[in-house]
Structure formats: C-alpha cells, structure tokens
C-alpha cells in the first residue's frame, strides 16, 4: 500500500509539475506576445508622412506664388487704369469742344476763338492719348457690341447689314478697356 501511496504521490507530483510547467509555458508565451507588442509599437509610416509633408509644402508654395501673381496683376491694373475716373470726367469736355468747333462763322473774331478752341481740344486729346486713351473707330466698321452701342437701325442701300453708318457720340478705350462705347447708327 505504501508503494501505491508513493506511486500516487509521484503521479500527483508529476502532474503538478507538468501543470506548473504548462502554466509557465503559457504565461511565458503570453508575456512574450505582450512584450513584443510593447517593444515594437506600430512603426509610423515615415515615408508616407514625408511624402504628405512635401505635397503640402508644394501646395503652399503654389498658393503663395498664385497670391503674389494676383497681387502683381492687380497692382499693374491699378496703375494702368488709375486715370480712368478723371478720363471719364474729361470726355464730356472733349465732346463739348467738338460741338463748339462745329459752329460755322464768317466773323473773324469767332474764327480766332474757334482756332483757340481747336488748339485746346488738340492739347486735351494729346494728353488723353498720352494716358492711353484711344478713340474707337466707328463709321464704316462692322458693328461690335463690345465697342458700339446701337441707337438706331436703318435699312441702307449704301452699306452692308451690320455696318456702322453714323456716329452720334465718340467712344473711347483706356488701353484695352472700353470706358465709353460709341453711340452709332447701324445698317440693317
């Protein structure tokens, strides 16, 4: 019996040792897996971050270049068209000088006054031209709604359809911008 007890004790001890070893192995495997997770955190994708940072930098540079270009163009336009307001105010003076020059007289005094008016008009027109003001050609030209304002349309045997036959008020451009369209009569 004693042998049986000893065998049972041995078996129990062996079983206990095997269980302890198994638990130790299980714990050790779990610890290793956890240790691996702790020791090797998910490596950040530095290449992707670098590529994203470079792309962001390129976008910012492009945005800044566009900003500088827009500001430069706006500054150029402000300088180019800075005289537009005063030119618009001076154009009625040119019209009035043209009307004054249409007066016909045999009187010598009136003729000398008209000569003076002609000189003033010529000087004013030269000054406007130096500022970039250009008279829009009208009579005999094809009607262009960007340059001309049709006031009258009449059938004409002398002109083709869509051709300006008369000008009621001169039109002007400042550089490439229309500041006043020509008021015209157009052939149908």
Curated annotation (Swiss-Prot):
UniProt-recorded Gene Ontology molecular function terms: adenyl-nucleotide exchange factor activity; protein homodimerization activity; protein-folding chaperone binding; unfolded protein binding
Region (Disordered): 1-26
Keyword Thylakoid attached: no
Compositionally biased intervals (Low complexity): 1-22
Domain of life: Bacteria
Keywords: Chaperone, Cytoplasm, Stress response
Span of the signal peptide: none
GO biological process: protein folding
Main location per the UniProt record: cytoplasm
Cellular component terms per the entry's GO annotation: cytoplasm
Cytoplasm keyword on record: yes
SUPFAM superfamilies cross-referenced by the UniProt entry: Coiled-coil domain of nucleotide exchange factor GrpE, Head domain of nucleotide exchange factor GrpE
InterPro entries: GrpE, GrpE_coiled_coil, GrpE_head
Classification via CDD domains: GrpE
Subcellular location: Cytoplasm
Family, similarity comment: Belongs to the GrpE family.
Subunit structure: Homodimer.
PANTHER family: GRPE PROTEIN, GRPE PROTEIN HOMOLOG, MITOCHONDRIAL
Role, per record: Participates actively in the response to hyperosmotic and heat shock by preventing the aggregation of stress-denatured proteins, in association with DnaK and GrpE. It is the nucleotide exchange factor for DnaK and may function as a thermosensor. Unfolded proteins bind initially to DnaJ; upon interaction with the DnaJ-bound protein, DnaK hydrolyzes its bound ATP, resulting in the formation of a stable complex. GrpE releases ADP from DnaK; ATP binding to DnaK triggers the release of the substrate protein, thus completing the reaction cycle.
Protein name: Protein GrpE
Organism: Exiguobacterium sibiricum (strain DSM 17290 / CCUG 55495 / CIP 109462 / JCM 13490 / 255-15)
């Amino acid at each position: 019996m004693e042998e049986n007890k000893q065998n049972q004790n041995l078996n129990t001890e062996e079983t206990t040792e095997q269980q302890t070893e198994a638990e130790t192995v299980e714990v050790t495997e779990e610890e290793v897996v956890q240790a691996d997770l702790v020791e090797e955190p998910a490596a950040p994708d530095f290449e992707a971050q670098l590529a994203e940072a470079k792309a962001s930098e390129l976008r910012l540079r492009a945005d800044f270049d566009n900003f500088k270009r827009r500001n430069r163009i706006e500054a150029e336009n402000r300088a180019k068209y800075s005289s537009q307001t005063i030119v618009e105010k001076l154009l009625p003076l040119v019209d009035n000088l043209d009307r004054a020059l249409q007066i016909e007289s045999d009187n010598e005094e009136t003729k000398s006054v008209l000569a003076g008016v002609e000189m003033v008009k010529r000087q004013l027109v030269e000054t406007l031209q130096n500022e970039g003001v250009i008279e829009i050609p009208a009579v005999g030209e094809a009607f262009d709604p960007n340059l001309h304002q049709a006031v009258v349309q009449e059938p004409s045997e002398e002109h083709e359809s869509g051709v300006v036959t008369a000008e009621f008020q001169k039109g002007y451009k400042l550089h490439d911008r229309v500041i006043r369209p020509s008021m015209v009569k157009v052939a149908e």
